[in-house]
Amino acid sequence: AASPGVISVFLPNKFYASEDEYLDKLSNLMAIEYKEITNAGLQLQLDCPDLALARHMTFKELSEKDFLIRAEKQIECLNAALTKIDSSKIRMHICWGNYEGPHTFDIGLEKILPIILKANIKYLSIESSNPRHAHEWQVFENIKLPKNKILIPGVIDSTSNFVEHPDVVANRLIQFSKVINKEQLMAGTDCGFS
């Protein structure tokens, strides 16, 4: 399901007095959808590229500080939409977009991770195989994953025509296991839609 933040990125506000008011309204509406999904016994996966991709796509005119303030608000609204849902039923996917561009303006994981970790979710899926973000397993040396969360690093690159050798995939997961408890790791792909 789309997060309130990503909806606001792809369907810009043209009605409400402020972006914050728009996000609040989206949060209230999406809370209904999220509850219906989990009430049906399904796992809720939230797509949240607004917390990474939107930095260089939509909010490039903002200073980094102002973007991070915006990201805080997006997490606040997301959490408001999730208040009645057990976090163990929620996955959140963060990405910088799976297009084949240079990604030279991507915001680093170390800058957004402290904000992302405030989300009331259990499972966090991140891109980590593409060449621009493959090194970011190291971020978890300094920013510890809370004990109540499970990281799903993308260990398969969804933007390449190459099929990775099984040892490459295993080594990517092993890198993460050096900085995160193995019980808190689950292999995934770089794309939340894969």
Describe the residue ranges of each PLM region.
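Domain-level signal for soluble alpha/beta catalytic cores
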Residues: A1-S194
